[in-house]
Design a protein with these regions (language model features):
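Structured C-terminal cores of nucleic-acid metabolism proteins
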Residues: 326, 348, 358-520
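Exposed alpha-helical structural elements
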Residues: 67, 81, 98, 102, ...
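A short, sequence-level motif marking secondary-structure junctions
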Residues: 40-44, 70-73, 231-237, 308-311, ...
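Charge-lined substrate channels and their catalytic hotspots, especially those that engage the 3′ end
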Residues: 1-157, 164-210, 240-241, 245, ...
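Short, charge-rich amphipathic segments
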Residues: 91, 95-96, 104-110, 203-208, ...
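Feature marking long nucleic-acid-engaging regions of large polymerase/nuclease enzymes
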Residues: 34-36, 133-366, 417, 422-459
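Charged, low-complexity, helix-prone segments enriched in Lys/Glu/Asp/Gln
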Residues: 3-5, 78, 82-85, 102-107, ...
Length: 520
């Protein structure tokens, strides 16, 4: 499968309709461009935000004029503008009927049906299992089971939705998922990689429903993974937990229930041990600075707050990292073609520049080796600096997080996908892949197919040449999605600022932080 072309809808333009004399014209909304005369359309009025198709009018009077393809809403409604951004950047906002038809046939399959079983799928439905996700999540692609062993060790099961059981190579839905590469999450909306019948239903690990999964089983002694095994499985989640509820259980303000309460306690201890080991290895430690937004029913953004990273977030993070590392190590050892998540080591000068910048701002820094730093030494220095920075920010009530975090990120190279295992410097991992989110990332689906071919013999391994071509394609789709998500965040923040200025007056004083410096 070669890299597919851009979405057919990418040529459509987003504009605002305006009246210019006797003509109805489309004024480009996001970027400068020529105004286009538009054929009249009863679906849209002057001032509306619309998608137009240039020069597609067919009647004699309107020949050569643009036509309204879709009315999006109003330019003074945040949700409408974010929707417009997604379309302007080429997102389809839906699936072709042929893809939807293919998916309807897939979701009608019973999870226990022979067509979904594959070779040696283990029945784990009696095992206490739970999910932990954001309160607003709709697609649940990972679940956890855990148990304490008599010898003091622990056994962890990380169950990941078996998307590969439904989405077969070169099927219509597979081609469309590859074209998209990833789901795109913006405030109040999502452009899913898979149709919602799969992402929110058949593949989603909702409680009380049988679901096919791929399981990574790990025996963990302290902070060391003693052994691991991999197999297809069938689970039934007992509880859908969210981060807030888990944090309440951890701080004692809420109670856990059985059958999942004991498993959660074991998982908490295991995750803490794995996290402590990562810290000792100088893994980069940075909390997210992404904002979260609230909307009213009309689509107006009403509130914004920075996303908080808590112990419950870190629990899932550490367990997913462990599973990803184990899968990557197995695939590398067996030389199965797959996509690795690689993060090449930073340069010594970049590490030294970061240390100098942090020190000039009064932030504690780690010792730096004398002379020129090797890439590994640079990675160790930046990782240690990030951990000291996180503690310093926490002691200052979170002030300066966004600007200081950006300094660390700029000192690092950008992570990407590669068919070669080049290691993951930020995590200090010798082998790493993305395996735990196949509902929303295509590279994870590639890893699933590689893994089940290696351990279960279910289908051929991905073709090595095709995997090599998929690496730059999926990396580009990820960067594109991040650009759209950041643009949507900026739009929502602008609406919040506009609302406060309107309600409180333009003479208001706002507190802020310097997050960067540009030349004069």
């Amino acid at each position: 499968m070669s890299a597919p072309p851009q979405a057919p809808g990418a040529a459509a333009r987003v504009a605002v309709l305006e009246r210019r004399g006797k003509f109805l014209v489309a004024e480009p909304f996001f970027e400068a461009g020529p105004r286009l005369v538009v054929s009249r359309d009863r679906r849209a009025d002057v001032g509306d935000l619309v998608v137009i198709n240039p020069g597609t009018a067919r009647n004699r009077r309107g020949a050569g004029r643009a036509t309204v393809a879709r009315r999006l809403g109003r330019p003074d409604v945040a949700r409408d503008v974010i929707e417009a951004l997604m379309i302007d950047r080429g997102l389809r906002r839906g699936f072709d009927p042929a893809v939807e038809h293919e998916v309807r046939d897939l979701v009608e399959l019973d999870p226990t049906a022979e067509a979904l079983q594959g070779a040696g799928r283990r029945d784990l439905r009696s095992m206490p299992t739970f999910t932990i996700d954001p309160a607003t999540a709709r697609d649940f692609d990972d679940a956890i089971s855990a148990a304490a062993e008599d010898d003091g060790s622990a056994r962890m099961w990380v169950h990941i939705a078996d998307v590969s059981a439904y989405v077969r190579p070169r099927s219509l839905v597979d081609r469309e998922a590859y074209r998209r590469g990833t789901s795109v999450y913006v405030p109040g909306a999502v452009e899913p990689m898979l149709p919602t019948a799969l992402s929110n239903n058949a593949c989603s690990l909702v409680p009380g429903q049988d679901r096919p999964t791929v399981t990574v089983e790990m025996q963990i002694d302290g902070d060391r993974i003693r052994s691991s095994s991999f197999y297809r499985s069938l689970i039934r989640s007992d509880e859908r937990l969210d981060y807030g509820r888990v944090d309440q259980i951890f701080d004692g303000s809420a109670n856990a229930s059985e059958p999942w309460g004991a498993a959660l306690d074991v998982a908490r201890k295991v995750a803490a041990a794995l996290g402590a080991r990562r810290a000792l290895q100088s893994a980069v430690e940075l909390e997210s600075t992404e904002p979260e937004f609230e909307f009213d029913r009309k689509g107006n953004v009403t509130a914004a707050a920075p996303a908080e990273q808590t112990e419950s977030h870190r629990l899932i993070e550490h367990l997913m990292i462990a599973a990803n590392e184990q899968v990557a190590a197995l695939l590398e050892a067996r030389k199965v073609p797959t996509l690795y998540r690689v993060h090449e080591p930073p340069d010594g000068p970049a590490a030294q520049r970061l240390i100098d910048q942090l020190a000039s701002l009064g932030v504690p820094t780690p010792p730096v080796p004398r002379g020129s730093m090797t890439p590994q030494q640079a990675a160790d220095v930046i990782g240690s600096a990030s951990q000291l920075l996180e503690r310093w920010i926490a002691s200052h009530d979170g002030r300066g997080r966004r600007g200081l975090t950006s300094l660390v990120l700029r000192s690092l190279k950008q992570a990407h996908y590669d068919n070669r295992n080049l290691g993951h410097s930020g995590l200090q991992s010798s082998s790493y892949c993305h395996f735990t989110s196949p509902i929303r990332r295509y590279p994870d689906l590639i890893c699933h197919r590689a893994l089940v071919s290696a351990v279960a013999g279910d289908g051929p391994a991905p073709d090595a040449g095709w995997v090599a071509s998929a690496a730059p394609w999926t990396s580009a789709r990820e960067r594109e999605a991040m650009s759209i998500e950041r643009g949507a965040d900026d739009i929502a923040l602008c609406f919040i600022l506009e609302q406060r200025l309107f309600e409180q007056g333009s003479d208001q004083v706002f507190e802020g932080e310097v997050v960067g410096v540009i030349g004069a």
